[in-house]
């Protein structure tokens, strides 16, 4: 399961569908049943939870996100700290063939140390380093960065920041658009213990979504073991 990617679209979609079904089935407090009729009528896409192409959140994005109780500058600082964490983990991951030298890490560290996170400064830095950072990160297409969304909703997103995509998901759910429960959980960071950063889908968030106590592997493994016992 951990090796599934966007390119394995049918298998990955099936695994995420089963994950949603089992999550609902395992929830003793949930009165919701999975709407198979709606699922069959819709076309479904694999949505990247977070594509770093969205860049640091803008003032407007932060201010209209009612879940954020911090300033736009603080949100952008958290974004770059998250990027630094992703870069650091990429250098330590022996599975990543595209190993990083220290230049991108050093650039982000220096930027963080300067402490200026106004919108224009952050956008200028991101425009300068975005391509090299994204080329070195890799693994944007792995299952721990994917979720199910209706095609008509997904294709309206484009490259937006995580905080903006999160706002759209919440609003779509409020407007009674069916959003799979695990997709909602992802953008609410339900799988992450004590989440404080809603600007970026971090390495820790991905690990919790994939392998945490309520994550994909744990949920499916429990189901498959029960099936085997029967």
Regions found by a protein language model. Name each.
Residues 1-124, 138:
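Intrinsically disordered, low-complexity N-proximal targeting/linker segments that flank membranes
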Residues 86-230:
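Long, cytosolic, alpha-helical-rich C-terminal regions that act as interaction/scaffolding modules
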